[in-house]
């Protein structure tokens, strides 16, 4: 990757207040290179420019890292492995399962796990309603579904006392209003992604 990509990544991580060791930094840059390479053939993301990938994929995913405690994390609708791969790189103690029904995207996830040597990540190709592994401490979604749908489809997979982490636009009030009465919002956190003017929030939810 170019020096400009490296500089953008380093500055963005510092702005997010994340301390990243050399191994994690190398893996993030390797993930970026792999995503850029595969995207030319497999159209994994609409973002083509590597510098924009740093902002809109790596830093956007990293922006929720301080809310992730795990240890068992499920990334639903993971697509090209975002945010799951980034979170697994930043915190090797996490046990990350990435779930997506799109075969080419899961193949990319598996290749990334192999090439980056990530022993704490398990990619799974399946629809969420057919997935039966349970007791995840946290379930994260970056661009999966409406909030109420996300909660209802993944409810059986969440451990007692577990949390949902939903990355949404800041106009999420209508989606919050449609949540079932036994689900409560415990935190609404504005996401300030370095270099990205998009208005985003992280919603932390729990069973009431």
From Swiss-Prot:
Q: Which GO terms describe its cellular component?
A: cytosol
| CDD domains for the chain | AdoMet_MTases
Q: Which reaction does it catalyse?
A: guanosine(527) in 16S rRNA + S-adenosyl-L-methionine = N(7)-methylguanosine(527) in 16S rRNA + S-adenosyl-L-homocysteine
Q: What's the domain of life for this entry? A: Bacteria
| Subcellular location, record wording | Cytoplasm
List GO molecular-function terms, semicolon-separated: rRNA (guanine-N7-)-methyltransferase activity
Keyword terms: Cytoplasm, Methyltransferase, rRNA processing, S-adenosyl-L-methionine, Transferase
Instruction: Give the residue spans that cross the bilayer.
Output: none
Q: Per UniProt, where does S-adenosyl-L-methionine bind?
A: 77, 82, 128-129, 142
EC no. given is 2.1.1.170
Q: Which family does the UniProt entry place this protein in?
A: Belongs to the methyltransferase superfamily. RNA methyltransferase RsmG family.
General function of this protein: Specifically methylates the N7 position of guanine in position 527 of 16S rRNA.
Task: Tell me the protein's name.
Answer: Ribosomal RNA small subunit methyltransferase G
Show the taxonomic lineage: Bacteria, Pseudomonadati, Pseudomonadota, Gammaproteobacteria, Oceanospirillales
């Amino acid at each position: 990757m170019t020096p400009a990509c490296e500089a953008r990544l380093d500055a963005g991580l510092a702005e997010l207040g994340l301390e990243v060791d050399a191994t994690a930094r190398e893996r993030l840059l390797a993930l970026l290179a792999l995503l850029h390479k595969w995207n030319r053939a497999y159209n994994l993301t609409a973002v083509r420019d590597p510098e924009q990938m740093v902002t809109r994929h790596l830093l956007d995913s990293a922006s929720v890292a301080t809310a992730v405690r795990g240890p068992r994390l499920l990334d639903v609708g993971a697509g090209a492995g975002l945010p799951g791969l980034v979170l697994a790189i930043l915190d090797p103690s996490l046990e990350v399962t990435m779930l997506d029904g799109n075969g080419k995207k899961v193949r990319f996830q598996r290749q990334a796990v192999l090439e980056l040597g990530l022993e704490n990540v398990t990619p799974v190709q399946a629809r969420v309603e057919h997935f039966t592994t349970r007791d995840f401490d946290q379930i994260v979604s970056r661009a999966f579904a409406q909030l109420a749908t996300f909660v209802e489809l993944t409810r059986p997979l969440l451990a007692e006392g577990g949390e949902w982490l939903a990355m949404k636009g800041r106009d999420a009030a209508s989606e919050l209003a449609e949540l079932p009465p036994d689900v409560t919002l415990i935190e609404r956190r504005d996401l300030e992604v370095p270099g990205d003017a998009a208005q985003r929030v992280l919603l932390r939810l729990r069973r009431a």
